[in-house]
């Protein structure tokens, strides 16, 4: 018999780095979840932009079960068919010529930064080690990636941090230009800052970074962990902008809920990563790559990408209608199905409170800092689920505006 557990057990047994919602989801189907008490939620959080095809998608379950009935793991001393097939699909669909598989976005970014440093050291010299990143970015929780993230809240307790990382202002080319020089080995940037507030880069900013990197022989890394795999209405956001990076990192939606990450790059840059320079025990696991291969098959189609753009319009229209009623947002921004509602000054700092009220109303949303409510739903969310979920979100806004919720 299974052990009966409650939300209170989390506080008793788990390391307290999270404060989960007061309910425990136990079942999902499409863009709906149900908790232990049977309450239904429309899921506009998507596991933080992970569940790109919703919960328990039949094709993903079939791919997972088929591979699970064969074998689960061998380690990196052997390759496997699902990993090779997925690598070829990613290469055929992007600028990349080489792929490194891992288990998360943080690991993919760690690999990208290590590759950039090694390439610069091998081709130029050890003095070329500088990394330029951006304030309020998020690249993961390893010591290297959290240092690149530019959010002191996440890194200040873990000093000394890796050196030679400097942070420019996002969407400010002059700020970046002042830091990028001949000692810079890499520039790492999110095409849309997700955790930093759902802020899309401008075309001029990304194009300018491309030109600065070319001028100073630095590698341009696009962190597409959150924007990748169809989220913005293109398979990867660099395609939306028409700016090609030297290295791209991807995770989250790539596995549709099954943990996987990948670093994509060219043959020239990959060539410096010789046997033993980097590795991972689980990266390229056949279970993960079998599922991810099916995710790509479904998402990398014109129909799916056109659908994301149409759903974007539906969200924007309804969110604008909600804002006309309640006047809570100063801006609604984002690309595709990564959207952020920026709170007006009178509601500043209450994004978490709105998310909590939304859950009470039966819809799950995210935050991006204290002032932005974030939406990252499944890419195949239905029109009915959009309508129902945003009706519930409107109810949460109404309750908050009426004073039915408090910061306590």
Swiss-Prot record:
Keywords: Aminotransferase, Arginine metabolism, Pyridoxal phosphate, Transferase. GO terms for biological process: alpha-amino acid biosynthetic process; arginine catabolic process to glutamate; arginine catabolic process to succinate; ornithine catabolic process. Coiled coil: none annotated. Its cofactor is pyridoxal 5'-phosphate. It is an enzyme of class 2 (transferase). The modification N6-(pyridoxal phosphate)lysine is found at residue 252. Pathway: Amino-acid degradation; L-arginine degradation via AST pathway; L-glutamate and succinate from L-arginine: step 3/5. Its EC number is 2.6.1.81. It comes from the Bacteria. Gene3D superfamilies: Aspartate Aminotransferase, domain 1 (3.90.1150.10), Type I PLP-dependent aspartate aminotransferase-like (Major domain) (3.40.640.10). One of its GO terms (molecular function) is identical protein binding. It catalyses: N(2)-succinyl-L-ornithine + 2-oxoglutarate = N-succinyl-L-glutamate 5-semialdehyde + L-glutamate. Catalyzes the transamination of N(2)-succinylornithine and alpha-ketoglutarate into N(2)-succinylglutamate semialdehyde and glutamate. Can also act as an acetylornithine aminotransferase. HAMAP family: ArgD_aminotrans_3, AstC_aminotrans_3. Belongs to the class-III pyridoxal-phosphate-dependent aminotransferase family. AstC subfamily. PANTHER family: AMINOTRANSFERASE CLASS III, SUCCINYLORNITHINE TRANSAMINASE. This is Succinylornithine transaminase.
């Amino acid at each position: 018999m299974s052990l009966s557990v409650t939300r209170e057990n989390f506080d008793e047994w788990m390391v307290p780095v999270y404060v989960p919602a007061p309910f425990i989801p136990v079942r999902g189907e499409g863009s709906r979840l149900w908790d232990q008490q049977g309450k239904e939620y429309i899921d506009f959080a998507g596991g933080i932009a992970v569940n790109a095809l919703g919960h328990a998608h039949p094709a993903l379950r079939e791919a997972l079960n088929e591979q699970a009935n064969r074998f689960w793991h061998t380690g990196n001393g052997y390759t496997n068919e699902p990993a090779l097939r997925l690598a070829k699909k990613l290469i055929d669909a992007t600028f990349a010529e080489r792929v490194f598989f891992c288990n998360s976005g943080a690991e993919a970014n760690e690999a990208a930064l290590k590759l950039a440093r090694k390439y610069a050291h091998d081709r130029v010299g050890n003095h070329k080690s500088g990394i330029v990143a951006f304030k309020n970015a998020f690249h993961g929780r390893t010591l290297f990636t959290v240092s690149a993230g530019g959010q002191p809240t996440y890194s200040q307790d873990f000093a000394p941090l890796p050196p030679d990382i400097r942070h420019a202002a996002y969407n400010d080319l002059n700020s970046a230009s002042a830091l990028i020089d001949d000692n810079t080995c890499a520039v790492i940037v999110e095409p849309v800052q997700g955790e930093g507030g759902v802020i899309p880069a401008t075309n001029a900013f990304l194009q300018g970074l491309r030109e600065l990197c070319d001028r100073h022989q630095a590698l341009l890394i696009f962190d597409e962990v959150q924007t990748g795999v169809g989220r913005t209405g293109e398979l990867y956001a660099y395609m939306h902008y028409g700016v090609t990076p030297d290295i791209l990192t991807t995770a989250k939606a790539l596995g549709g809920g099954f943990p996987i990450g990948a670093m994509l790059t060219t043959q020239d840059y990959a060539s410096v990563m010789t046997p033993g320079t980097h590795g991972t025990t689980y990266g390229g696991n056949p279970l993960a790559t079998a599922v991810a291969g099916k995710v790509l098959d479904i998402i990398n189609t014109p129909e799916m990408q056109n659908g994301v753009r149409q759903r974007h319009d539906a969200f924007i229209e309804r969110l604008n209608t909600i804002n006309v009623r309640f006047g809570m947002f100063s801006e609604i921004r984002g690309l595709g199905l990564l959207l952020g509602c920026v709170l007006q000054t009178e509601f500043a700092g209450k994004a978490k409170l709105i998310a909590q009220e939304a859950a009470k109303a039966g819809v799950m949303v995210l935050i991006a800092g204290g002032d932005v409510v974030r939406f990252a739903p499944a890419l195949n969310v239905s029109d009915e689920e959009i309508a129902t979920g945003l009706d519930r979100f409107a109810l949460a806004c109404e309750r908050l505006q009426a004073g039915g919720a408090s910061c306590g």
